[in-house]
Amino acid sequence: MVRPRRAPYRSGAGGPLGGRGRPPRPLVVRAVRSRSWPASPRGPQPPRIRARSAPPMEGARVFGALGPIGPSSPGLTLGGLAVSEHRLSNKLLAWSGVLEWQEKRRPYSDSTAKLKRTLPCQAYVNQGENLETDQWPQKLIMQLIPQQLLTTLGPLFRNSQLAQFHFTNRDCDSLKGLCRIMGNGFAGCMLFPHISPCEVRVLMLLYSSKKKIFMGLIPYDQSGFVSAIRQVITTRKQAVGPGGVNSGPVQIVNNKFLAWSGVMEWQEPRPEPNSRSKRWLPSHVYVNQGEILRTEQWPRKLYMQLIPQQLLTTLVPLFRNSRLVQFHFTKDLETLKSLCRIMDNGFAGCVHFSYKASCEIRVLMLLYSSEKKIFIGLIPHDQGNFVNGIRRVIANQQQVLQRNLEQEQQQRGMGG
């Protein structure tokens, strides 16, 4: 482990962490959850933080506010955690190494190419804390993620250990580029390699363009955070088109956050008897802020069967106990208009998940509101009973269609 030592006091305007000629106010910590780690019978234990007798923690103020991190924010805020002014004086060096990340090249170059950046960096903790970093790798690999995709991780962010990151100002272009990217709404996710024996698996890096500081958050619930961040990264990849270029502003719709992207396929009846046409649309599923919908196991294509709503009245109790999500369809306007017309005329969509898929969801229902012009998905909590109920509904529908067909044939025969 790197022996803790006092960080040099920096003043003046030099560097992104420099002050402005006056010492910052002393700061305190409040509204932080307990720093004790819950006992875990399995898996690696969370990072150990030894608290010694010391003055109250300085350098961090934690508020309960929630807001965006950006050039206009008074501090770092994400998921209810806000980090205000910091200074490196009275902090102890916990780790030294190199941070590596990739950023897009300038617009005039190949948009699919990435530029690798590296900077020497150090992590500092407050006096009285000891972050076990002796097993940390000498190089940390960081992935940049839009902050808007991380709001669902608020509870995990609030229960985190803070460490301040400082970059040695040897490469001004790299440092300015990192400040510019993170100041425009990106956060850094550092995933530690599994071959590393340290107990930390993931660390988040945030930046305040106003305070000129980088703050690292080490979630205490490492396993829960790793699972959640993997879903975020998967969702990000699904929302990005070929070559890593965004297919459009589909991450947020009406303050909802993207949970899944793929294709919806269904069949529509045609004017000819017993004839159907196959239709499909690119689709996206959104959830409310603060909610997590685990979609990493969802298939890329969902198959929907159109059912008359009048046949679903027996399933109303199961509908009431459902989770709501919002569907958004893009591209083919004529196909979308046709789907809206059919569902507005009394049909609902039953989306079946393939049994090959390992996700827990087996079926969800899609409804359309012509008044609000939105598609709502209902995911019943009682999947087993709902699957059995919907099977009975589909069987009844087939019987009704068969009877109607027989009656039409009889009427034609009598008319002849």
Curated annotation (Swiss-Prot):
Keyword field contains Phosphoprotein: yes
Q: Which residues carry this modification: Phosphoserine?
A: S53
Task: Give Gene Ontology CC terms.
Answer: nucleoplasm; perinuclear region of cytoplasm; plasma membrane; transcription regulator complex
Post-translational modification here is noted as: Ubiquitinated by the CRL2(KLHDC2) complex, which recognizes the diglycine (Gly-Gly) at the C-terminus, leading to its degradation. Ubiquitinated by the CRL2(APPBP2) complex, which recognizes the Arg-Xaa-Xaa-Gly sequence at the C-terminus, leading to its degradation.
- Can you cite a GO biological process for this protein? positive regulation of transcription by RNA polymerase II
Q: Which Pfam families match?
A: Med25
Region annotation Interaction with FLOT1: where it falls in the sequence: 184-416
Q: Which residues does UniProt call coiled coil?
A: none
Spell out the Gly residues composition-biased ranges. 12-21
Q: Where in the cell is it found?
A: Cytoplasm; Nucleus; Cell membrane; Cytoplasm, Perinuclear region
Q: Where is this region: Disordered?
A: 1-53
Q: Which InterPro entries match?
A: Med25_PTOV (IPR021394), Med25_PTOV_sf (IPR038196)
Expression is induced as follows: By testosterone.
User: Mind telling me which Gene3D superfamilies this protein's record contains?
Assistant: Mediator complex subunit 25, ACID domain
Q: Where is the composition biased (Low complexity)?
A: 27-36
Q: Which UniProt keywords apply?
A: Activator, Cell membrane, Cytoplasm, Membrane, Nucleus, Phosphoprotein, Transcription, Transcription regulation, Ubl conjugation
Asked if the keyword Transcription belongs to this entry, the reply reads yes
Task: Report where it is expressed, by tissue.
Answer: Expressed in brain, heart, kidney, liver, placenta, skeletal muscle and small intestine.
Question: Quaternary arrangement and interactors, per the entry?
Answer: May interact with CREBBP. Interacts with FLOT1.
Q: What does this protein do?
A: May activate transcription. Required for nuclear translocation of FLOT1. Promotes cell proliferation.
Record's family?
A: Belongs to the Mediator complex subunit 25 family. PTOV1 subfamily.
Name of the molecule in the record: Prostate tumor-overexpressed gene 1 protein
State the organism's lineage.
Eukaryota, Metazoa, Chordata, Craniata, Vertebrata
